[in-house]
Amino acid sequence: MATSTISAPSSVRNVILTGFMGTGKSSVGRLLAHRLGFRYCDLDALIVEGEGVSINEIFARHGEPHFRALETEAVRSVSREERCVVSTGGGAVISPENRCLLRKAGVVVNLTATVEEVCRRLREETDRPLLKDDRSGERIAAMMAEREQFYADAELRIDTTGKSVEDVVAEITGYLEGR
């Protein structure tokens, strides 16, 4: 598979990756940005940098509503950028304002995976505050179902189950080239 940089169509201002935690947004985002010659922006990393503490710490100290407000500020900030691949947090699309800003900012690509695949990918991670006490398939399935209507709003959806990062990036770049 070719690993060279490709040119995104001029109509593509940004590429926004949405999806549940563990669907590959960060891994795909970094490689996609490299391939497109775009910058990579991770919303959660921007929040951590701005607050000076981890997302787990933000949740513990201030709760989810405070985190979501910070997330909306980060979405506002990146929505003004150009030539970025943006990885959102899994819950960023819950907010109607965020969804609107993201759609206006670029091509929204939703990454999906089966509940089993997400559980496998998240098994060893400890930085997921909404799953801190419950990493069961039932909890993950319920959260995915709650968010499905928001994820379905994307321009392109890709199931990452059983696929390599390179394969997912190739699907996205193929879509962008044909757009």
UniProtKB/Swiss-Prot annotation:
Alphabetized InterPro entries for the sequence: P-loop_NTPase (IPR027417), Shikimate/glucono_kinase (IPR031322), Shikimate_kinase/TSH1 (IPR000623), Shikimate_kinase_CS (IPR023000)
SUPFAM superfamilies xref list: P-loop containing nucleoside triphosphate hydrolases
Keywords of the record: Amino-acid biosynthesis, Aromatic amino acid biosynthesis, ATP-binding, Cytoplasm, Kinase, Magnesium, Metal-binding, Nucleotide-binding, Transferase
EC numbers, comma separated: 2.7.1.71
Catalytic activity entry: shikimate + ATP = 3-phosphoshikimate + ADP + H(+)
Biochemical pathway: Metabolic intermediate biosynthesis; chorismate biosynthesis; chorismate from D-erythrose 4-phosphate and phosphoenolpyruvate: step 5/7
Binding sites annotated in the UniProt record for substrate: D44, R68, G90, R147
Cellular location(s): Cytoplasm
HAMAP family, per database record: Shikimate_kinase
Name of the protein in question: Shikimate kinase
Organism whose genome encodes this protein: Geobacter metallireducens (strain ATCC 53774 / DSM 7210 / GS-15)
